[in-house]
Regions:
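N-terminal accessory alpha/beta regions
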Residues: 13-140
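Extreme N-terminal leader/anchor segments
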Residues: 1-4, 21
Length: 481
C-alpha cells in the first residue's frame, strides 16, 4: 500500500525515500503528504547540487527558470522529483490540465521572458512581482475553489489565453465566460448560450497591465487590472440560481463596483451541485481509478465534503485518501500515467545522479505532454489518449537513455542479486513497480540476461542490468500508475 500511496499522492519514491517512508505508520504518511504546509520549501536550493537531478542551461547563460521556458520546465521537473511537498506539485499538475493555458500563444504577444513569468514566476525572484499561474495553482490548489477560480479569472496568462483583454461592454468576448462554466466548473449540459453571453458581460473590464521596468523584459511582469470603463454595469440574468435565495439575476451596479459581479457569479458556480460532482469525479479519476466507472457513493461523499466545507479542496482530498476505494488493491495501477508522472517515477526509481532534467524534455513532448503547453483549452487527452505508437517509442527511448546513464549505479545496487538471472529479474521487477508481468514476459527477461553465458561479472552486470531496466521501464505495464 505504501508504494501505491506514494505514486498517487506524489510521483513514486526513490529507494532511499521508500526506506524512510517505510518507517512510518500509513496514517502518518498520508497525513504528512496531505498537510504538506509543514514541510520545507527549500527544494530549489538543491538545484545544481551533483547529488540531485541535474539541469542544463543555455551555453554561457545562468539558470533562469523565471524568464526562460525550458529552464522553467526543468525546474518543475526538479520540484516533482525532489520536493518534500509532492502533493503540492501533483495538484499543480492536476490543475494545470484543468485550467489548461499554453505558453506559445502568450509568448507571441509579450515575448518569452514575460510569458515565462506569467506561466510560473517565483515572486521571490523579482521584488514585487506576481506569482505565475502554476505558482498560484500551488498556492491555492488545496484551498477554497472559489478563491482558486477568482485567481484564475484575474490571472494574466489566463486573461490573454482566452482573450479576456478584448472583453468590453461594447463588444463582449465570450471565451472565458463559456470556459469557466463548461471546463472549469459546471460542465457541459448545465448552462445555455444565454448564460454564456451573460457570463461574458460579468467579466468585462478584466484586463492586464505591465509593472516594473517596462523597458526591461527581465525586470517587468504583467498583473491583473480592472478597467471600470470597459465593464457592462447592467443586470445579468442566468438560467440557474446565482444567489442562495434562488435569484438568477446579478443586479445592475456602478461600473466601479463591477468586480462584485464576478464574485457573485463565481460563488454561484462553486456552490452549484454540478460543480461539486464534476470536481469530485475528476479527483476520483486522478487519484483512484480512471479505467472503471467512478464509485457513486464516494463521488457523493466527496461532493458533500466540498459543499459542507466552504468548497475546500483539501476537505475532499481528506475524505478521498481515507476511503476504502483509494486503498483497495483493485484500484492499484488503474490509471494511465501522464508523461510527467511517468518520467519522474522513472527518474526516482532508476536514479538521477548525473542525469539532467533537460534530457527528459524532448521525450516527454514525444510522449504527448510538454509542460506549460497543453494542446488547447480542453487540456490533454487523458487515459488511453496517452498510449500511442509514437508515445511507446518515446518511452522506450527514454528508458534506454536513463538506464544507460545510470548503469554503474544500477549495477552497484543489484550486486547482491548477481548470482543468477532469475534473482536479478526478481529484484528488478520489485524495484521498478508495475501492475505485474506474465510468466512469459518474465521468462523473456531471464532469457535476455542469458543471451550470453551468465557470469555476473561487473562489466556484464552493468550492461545487462541497464538493459533489463530498459525492458521494464519501457514496457507498457510501467505506464500504469
Amino acid at each position: 500500500m505504501l508504494e501505491h500511496i506514494l505514486r498517487r499522492m506524489g510521483f513514486a519514491a526513490s529507494p532511499a525515500e521508500l526506506a524512510a517512508w517505510s518507517a512510518l505508520p500509513i496514517e502518518t504518511v498520508i497525513d504528512r503528504l496531505l498537510n504538506y504546509e509543514t514541510q520545507s520549501t527549500d527544494h530549489d536550493v538543491k538545484i545544481g547540487d551533483p547529488n540531485y537531478l541535474g539541469i542544463t542551461t543555455q551555453t554561457g547563460q545562468p539558470f533562469s527558470p523565471n524568464t526562460l521556458i525550458n529552464d522553467a520546465r526543468q525546474r518543475w521537473l526538479f520540484r516533482m522529483t525532489h520536493s518534500q511537498r509532492p502533493l503540492e506539485e501533483k495538484m499543480a499538475l492536476f490543475w494545470h490540465n484543468h485550467f489548461a493555458t499554453g505558453y506559445t500563444k502568450i509568448a507571441g504577444a509579450v515575448g518569452q521572458e514575460r510569458a515565462t513569468r506569467m506561466m510560473d514566476n517565483d515572486p521571490n525572484s523579482l521584488a514585487g512581482s506576481e506569482p505565475g499561474q502554476i505558482q498560484k495553482l500551488r498556492m491555492y490548489g488545496t484551498g477554497s475553489f472559489a478563491t482558486l477560480l477568482m485567481e484564475m479569472a484575474k490571472d494574466p496568462a489566463m486573461i490573454y489565453w482566452l482573450d479576456s483583454q478584448l472583453n468590453t461592454r461594447t463588444r463582449p468576448q465570450e471565451n472565458f465566460g463559456r470556459e469557466i462554466m463548461e471546463l472549469f466548473s459546471l460542465g457541459i449540459g448545465n448552462y445555455t448560450e444565454q448564460d454564456v453571453y451573460a457570463a461574458a458581460r460579468v467579466f468585462t473590464g478584466f484586463n492586464w497591465q505591465i509593472r516594473g521596468e517596462a523597458a526591461n523584459v527581465n525586470g517587468s511582469w504583467y498583473t491583473y487590472r480592472y478597467v471600470a470603463n470597459d465593464h457592462d454595469p447592467t443586470a445579468k440574468t442566468f438560467t440557474f440560481a446565482i444567489y442562495p435565495d434562488g435569484g438568477k439575476t446579478i443586479p445592475a451596479r456602478p461600473a466601479a463596483q463591477g468586480e462584485q459581479d464576478a464574485l457573485d457569479f463565481i460563488l454561484a458556480l462553486v456552490r452549484n451541485p454540478a460543480t461539486a460532482r464534476r470536481i469530485a469525479t475528476r479527483l476520483y479519476k486522478f487519484f483512484v481509478n480512471e479505467i472503471a466507472e467512478p464509485d457513486p457513493a464516494l463521488i457523493t461523499s466527496l461532493a458533500n465534503a466540498y459543499l459542507g466545507n466552504n468548497y475546500n479542496i483539501k476537505s475532499m482530498l481528506r475524505v478521498l485518501f481515507a476511503s476504502p476505494q483509494f486503498r483497495d488493491q483493485a484500484n492499484y495501477f488503474q490509471r494511465y500515467s501522464w508523461p510527467a508522472e511517468y518520467v519522474v517515477k522513472a527518474i526516482k526509481e532508476v536514479g538521477y545522479v548525473g542525469f539532467s532534467a533537460n534530457n527528459a524534455m524532448t521525450p516527454m513532448s514525444n510522449m504527448g505532454q510538454q509542460l506549460y503547453e497543453p494542446p488547447d483549452v480542453n487540456g490533454w487527452e487523458l487515459g488511453p489518449g496517452w498510449v500511442s505508437t509514437s508515445g511507446m517509442l518515446a518511452r522506450m527511448n527514454f528508458a534506454a537513455t536513463l538506464a544507460g546513464n545510470q548503469r554503474f549505479n544500477l549495477a552497484r545496487d543489484a550486486a547482491a542479486y548477481r548470482q543468477s538471472p532469475e534473482r536479478l529479474v526478481e529484484y528488478a521487477q520489485s524495484r521498478f513497480r508495475t501492475m505485474g508481468f506474465s510468466a512469459t514476459q518474465t521468462t523473456a527477461m531471464t532469457d535476455y540476461l542469458r543471451s550470453t553465458a551468465w557470469t555476473g561479472a561487473d562489466a556484464q552486470l552493468q550492461t545487462r542490468m541497464a538493459g533489463l531496466t530498459r525492458l521494464i521501464v519501457g514496457a507498457g505495464e510501467y505506464v500504469f500508475n
